[in-house]
């Protein structure tokens, strides 16, 4: 098997049983190297879910992109999609902002202004910042707390840092933490599971659903199938995550 990629379907694993798991999947039999960068990999099947699109996985959320024009312009393609045309907002940075950091004081005001101008109050505002703020050493958590006070709703950071792609916490790892940090603690239910790690739903006839139901799981949550913020909050009832 050396030098050859190995894979196994869920059905094949089930047929083998727990006592006959392939050695390729048993970390105690050989070294399995997994770079932090692999956690940030987005497969073609994910339909292009980068930091910005993933940050809007929460139902009824909106995003404020704080960046120079050159960094934010590629979002215009996403903005043209029906599902996102009214969910992206921009706070452009100029040279003075970069030198003085004055744009940080504008963010809470911008968030409050956006929320006041919307007919429906968003569930959360995601603040997307770029490598510029990474180099400036911006404390975005503090800025988001100020924005929460100004707007009266949850505000979370979303780091579009290409610089950290190979680091301990790549952008896609951090955006997942931001998304699920909004779940409020609830009493756990033994027959509920969350499917995490991706932002598009599995196909309806995926064999994983039948396997989980056969194991006694009654409710399977996927963030992409949540219709509203209330349903998203029910994900905190899950007994375990897969």
Where do the protein language model's features map onto the residues?
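An N-terminal assembly and electron-transfer interface module characteristic of large anaerobic redox
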Residues: 1-242
């Amino acid at each position: 098997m050396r030098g050859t990629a190995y894979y196994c379907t869920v059905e094949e694993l089930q047929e083998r049983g727990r006592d006959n798991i392939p050695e390729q999947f048993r970390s105690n039999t050989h070294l399995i190297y997994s770079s932090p960068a692999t956690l940030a990999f987005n497969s073609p099947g994910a339909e292009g879910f980068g930091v910005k699109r993933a940050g809007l996985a929460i139902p009824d959320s909106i995003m404020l992109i704080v960046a120079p024009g050159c960094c934010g312009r590629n979002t215009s393609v996403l903005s043209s999609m029906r599902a996102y045309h009214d969910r992206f907002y921009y706070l452009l940075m100029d040279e003075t902002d970069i030198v003085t950091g004055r744009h940080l004081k504008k963010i809470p005001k911008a968030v409050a202004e956006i929320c006041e101008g919307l007919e429906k109050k968003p569930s959360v505002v995601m603040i997307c910042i770029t490598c510029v703020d990474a180099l400036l050493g911006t404390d975005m958590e503090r800025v988001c707390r100020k924005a929460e006070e100004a707007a009266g709703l949850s505000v979370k950071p979303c780091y579009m840092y290409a610089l950290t792609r190979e680091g301990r916490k790549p952008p896609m790892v951090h955006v997942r933490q931001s998304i699920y940090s909004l779940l409020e603690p609830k009493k756990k239910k033994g027959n509920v599971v969350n499917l995490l790690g991706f932002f598009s739903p599995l196909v309806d006839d995926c064999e994983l659903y039948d396997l989980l139901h056969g194991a006694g799981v009654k409710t399977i949550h996927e963030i992409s199938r949540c219709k509203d913020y209330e349903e998203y909050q029910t994900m905190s009832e899950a007994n375990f995550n897969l």
